[in-house]
Amino acid sequence: MAGAKEIRSKIGSVKSTQKITKAMEMVAASKMRRSQDAMEASRPYAETMRKVIGHVANASLEYRHPYLDEREAKRVGYIIISTDRGLCGGLNINVFKKAVTDMQAWKEKGAEVELAVIGSKATAFFKHGGAKVAAQVSGLGDSPSLEDLIGSVSVMLEKYDEGELDRLYLVFNKFVNTMVQQPTIDQLLPLPKSDSKDMQREHSWDYIYEPEPQALLDALLVRYVESQVYQGVVENLACEQAARMVAMKAATDNATNLIDDLELVYNKARQAAITQELSEIVGGAAAV
């Protein structure tokens, strides 16, 4: 059994670590609330944009934008969102597993796969795995802006425009609640048709365009893709803070249990030492 001094040292070390994890838990809780506010503020815009685009995809348009047309999927692109930092449980690895599974399914069909990665964890993971990474961005911080993402999104859109990609997907963690973060894959291009009930009844939509339909749709559809990627980033950020808060709370609780166990061992060691000293005193007295 370890000596009392060594055990006291371990207890002190665990208590120091516990203070750190508790502080990180509190910081993550504060950041999570701010991230949730940002996510909830941007959700209505992203969801409304998705509905409008779904209607456009179902409409009989006088100008047919290339983003609306299905084509044989020989080259598939993914925009994969991750965190820049760790200590957030299995958040990143879960979304990576989902992405890799989907990518593998396309590869088995003979398609080539190309990526744009957001977040240093995704960059490290997919580059280490030998994936073809066309664009990357990291260091977005706790308040990401659309301007930070436009470069990487533009790279993938240009590839789609030039026929170097036939499908484009967005991979991210969707915030459900504090305890649940759902790895999600959304199709960005070609534009998915609306799944609303009126669309299922084959409702026909008529549009009046001002200015010309080509200029309007060219701008609208690019803005749609950008808005979905931005929403994915803020959703993933809220997931990151929630997962980190939960992970740090678990670490703090584990530290408490470990301290209790070590204190029990310490008390046993101290009791054994006292018993040994008493035995030596009694033995010495008997010898005299």
UniProtKB/Swiss-Prot annotation:
GO CC terms, sorted: plasma membrane; proton-transporting ATP synthase complex
Recorded topology in the membrane: Peripheral membrane protein
Main localization (coarse): membrane
Keywords: ATP synthesis, Cell inner membrane, Cell membrane, CF(1), Hydrogen ion transport, Ion transport, Membrane, Transport
Pfam families: ATP-synt
Any one GO BP annotation for this protein: proton motive force-driven plasma membrane ATP synthesis
Domain of life: Bacteria
Entries under InterPro entries matching the protein: ATP_synth_F1_ATPase_gsu, ATP_synth_F1_gsu, ATP_synth_F1_gsu_CS
PROSITE patterns xrefs: ATPASE_GAMMA (PS00153)
GO molecular function list: ATP binding; proton-transporting ATP synthase activity, rotational mechanism
Annotated compartments: Cell inner membrane
NCBIfam families: ATPsyn_F1gamma, PRK05621.1-1
Subunit (UniProt): F-type ATPases have 2 components, CF(1) - the catalytic core - and CF(0) - the membrane proton channel. CF(1) has five subunits: alpha(3), beta(3), gamma(1), delta(1), epsilon(1). CF(0) has three main subunits: a, b and c.
Entry similarity comment: Belongs to the ATPase gamma chain family.
Stated role: Produces ATP from ADP in the presence of a proton gradient across the membrane. The gamma chain is believed to be important in regulating ATPase activity and the flow of protons through the CF(0) complex.
Name the UniProt record assigns to this protein: ATP synthase gamma chain
Annotated source species: Vibrio vulnificus (strain YJ016)
